[in-house]
């Protein structure tokens, strides 16, 4: 595995984790950072599989599950915006009282 590819994947992963931890008030930004993290993990898996000559069925299954995760996140975002008018987590929890 090339060091440049590994460094790129890890820097993308840690920047996604940083955005996920620092901008957690908006659901859309959280979902985008989660997709960013999934993309970096996919790149890391593909680099690992190319390096050791394994078969490529696992990345396809990984992409299917990540697409399902993205679709579920977007459906939660749409239902939250329809019911509350925005994607702030604070307004969502205040209306439960």
From Swiss-Prot:
InterPro entries the UniProt entry points to: NADH_UbQ_OxRdtase_chain4L/K, NUOK/Mnh_C1-like
EC number, as in UniProt: 7.1.1.2
GO CC annotations on file: mitochondrial membrane; NADH dehydrogenase complex
Intracellular or extracellular location(s): Mitochondrion membrane
Keywords, alphabetical: Electron transport, Membrane, Mitochondrion, NAD, Respiratory chain, Translocase, Transmembrane, Transmembrane helix, Transport, Ubiquinone
Family that this chain belongs to: Belongs to the complex I subunit 4L family.
Protein name: NADH-ubiquinone oxidoreductase chain 4L
Gene name per UniProt: ND4L
């Amino acid at each position: 595995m090339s060091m440049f590819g590994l460094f790129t994947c890890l820097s993308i992963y840690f920047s996604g984790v940083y955005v996920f931890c620092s901008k957690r008030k908006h659901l859309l930004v959280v979902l985008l950072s989660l997709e960013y993290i999934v993309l970096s993990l996919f790149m890391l898996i593909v680099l690992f599989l190319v390096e050791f000559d394994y078969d490529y069925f696992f990345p396809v299954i990984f992409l299917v599950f990540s697409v399902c995760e993205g679709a579920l996140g977007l459906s939660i975002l749409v239902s939250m915006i329809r019911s509350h008018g925005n994607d702030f987590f604070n307004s969502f929890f205040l209306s439960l009282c």
